[in-house]
């Protein structure tokens, strides 16, 4: 069934939803908002007044979608319900990214269906079964000692520099090195991964506006396919060889599937973990008592609180394959539902004192790795380990780190990113504040 702007408007008017106190025309995926701040107060207003709210969008201003808008989902339990019902709420229909450039061509949205994030069963089930081989506790555990050594080196080199951009010198390095180690990518090529992922996700940011994200994606896929060809000729004891060989149940990834898997790793793995690290350090700078506690205790619970607090993916979307009632609100077939993880992770009905950064928080049922179900983050354990290792290294080598300037935010309607953050690693800089 096709939904145009008018038919969606009629369906929305027939559904009784409270009206929150928001500025006229407010759009929760507007990248201009996130370039300046997070809409913390607006999310709180929705959770209180209209947890499931129709976010209308004018034609031509829907970030690549021309359906009149979407349902904004702001409470944690609703996010989890949508995530559990992948038979009702499709990742494939419109993809999971809720915001692109307004003038993006529909075929450029649809091509992203080749990435596992944007698949439904049974194709998603098959791919995830194969790819999960690389993320077993044993596979991740084998990286621990090497990544611990690398984390210490990263922090020591940054500390020796005295000051600099925390994002480029610290945050991005270990996630990139973890991915490089997992895939067997030469460490000297990790800079390419960094730039390709920036260019693919920052297409609405002025810093990357001159770059064609399709070209960056094509370069990365080409790089990955060449790597797969090399491993096919010269097998090794690594995850790439396992993924492209039919050594388990006769299943393997095609060259195309492997290429798009690397795209997913570069974005979903690298971008999210590095933004968690940056915003975790920002949180420690704003909550020095928690930093003192971390330096003394190094609690395992810290990584999950950092991910909850940062929520590096602001939102993903699904599309309803049939009519569905969600917490009393009628979702119509064809309508998009955008799960705002950033709001859900501060749900007052789930978290005690949600606006308190508490690295001992336990339990911590956040959705920073996705709601639950088929699309829960396959690399969550690797991300936790990476976060723990880098903060241990920062605590060892630059325990008195202080900000020099305010962070520069990424202009994105779905990714909570920090592009640059100047810091003094010694804590002695007189202009630090």
UniProtKB/Swiss-Prot annotation:
Its EC number is 1.14.15.29. Gene3D superfamilies: Cytochrome P450. Substrate binds at residue 202. It is an enzyme of class 1 (oxidoreductase). One of its GO terms (biological process) is cholesterol catabolic process. Pathway: Steroid metabolism; cholesterol degradation. Heme binds at residue 377. Belongs to the cytochrome P450 family. This is Steroid C26-monooxygenase. It comes from Mycobacterium tuberculosis (strain ATCC 25618 / H37Rv). The lineage of its organism: Bacteria, Bacillati, Actinomycetota, Actinomycetes, Mycobacteriales.
């Amino acid at each position: 069934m096709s939904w145009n702007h008018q038919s969606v408007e009629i369906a929305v008017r027939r559904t009784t939803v409270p009206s929150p106190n928001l500025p006229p025309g407010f759009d929760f995926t507007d990248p201009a908002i996130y370039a300046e701040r997070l809409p913390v107060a607006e999310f709180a207003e929705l959770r209180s007044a209209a947890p499931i709210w129709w976010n209308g969008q004018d034609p031509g201003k829907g970030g690549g979608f021309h359906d009149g808008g979407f349902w904004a989902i702001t409470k944690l339990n609703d996010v989890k319900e949508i995530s559990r019902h992948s038979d009702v709420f499709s990742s494939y229909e419109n993809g999971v990214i809720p915001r692109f450039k307004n003038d993006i061509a529909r075929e450029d949205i649809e091509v992203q269906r080749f990435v596992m994030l944007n698949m439904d069963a049974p194709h998603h089930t098959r791919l995830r079964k194969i790819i999960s081989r690389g993320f077993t506790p044993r596979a991740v555990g084998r990286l621990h000692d090497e990544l611990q050594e690398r984390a210490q080196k990263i922090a020591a080199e940054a500390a020796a520099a005295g000051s600099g951009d925390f994002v480029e010198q610290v945050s991005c390095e270990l996630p990139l090195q973890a991915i490089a180690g997992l895939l067997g990518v030469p460490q000297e090529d990790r800079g390419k991964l960094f730039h390709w992922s920036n260019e693919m996700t920052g297409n609405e940011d002025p810093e990357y506006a001159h770059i064609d994200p399709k070209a960056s994606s094509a370069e990365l896929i080409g790089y990955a396919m060449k790597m797969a060809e090399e491993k096919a000729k010269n097998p090794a004891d690594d995850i790439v060889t396992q993924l492209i060989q039919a050594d388990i149940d006769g299943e393997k990834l095609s060259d195309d599937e492997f290429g798009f898997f690397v795209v997913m790793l570069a974005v979903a793995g690298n971008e999210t973990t590095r933004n968690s690290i940056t915003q975790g350090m920002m949180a420690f700078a704003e909550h020095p008592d928690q930093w003192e506690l971390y330096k003394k205790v190094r609690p395992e619970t810290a990584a999950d609180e950092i991910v909850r607090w940062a929520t590096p993916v602001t939102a993903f979307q699904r599309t309803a394959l049939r009519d569905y009632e969600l917490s009393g609100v009628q979702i119509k077939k064809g309508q998009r539902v955008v799960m705002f993880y950033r709001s859900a992770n501060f749900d007052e009905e789930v978290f005690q004192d949600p606006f308190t950064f508490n690295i001992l928080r336990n339990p911590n049922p956040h959705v920073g790795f996705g709601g639950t179900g088929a699309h829960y983050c396959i690399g969550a354990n690797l991300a936790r380990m990476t976060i723990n290792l880098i903060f241990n290294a920062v605590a060892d080598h630059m325990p008195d780190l202080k900000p020099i300037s305010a962070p520069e935010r990424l202009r994105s309607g779905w990714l909570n990113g920090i592009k640059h953050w100047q810091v003094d690693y010694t804590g002695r800089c007189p202009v630090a504040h």
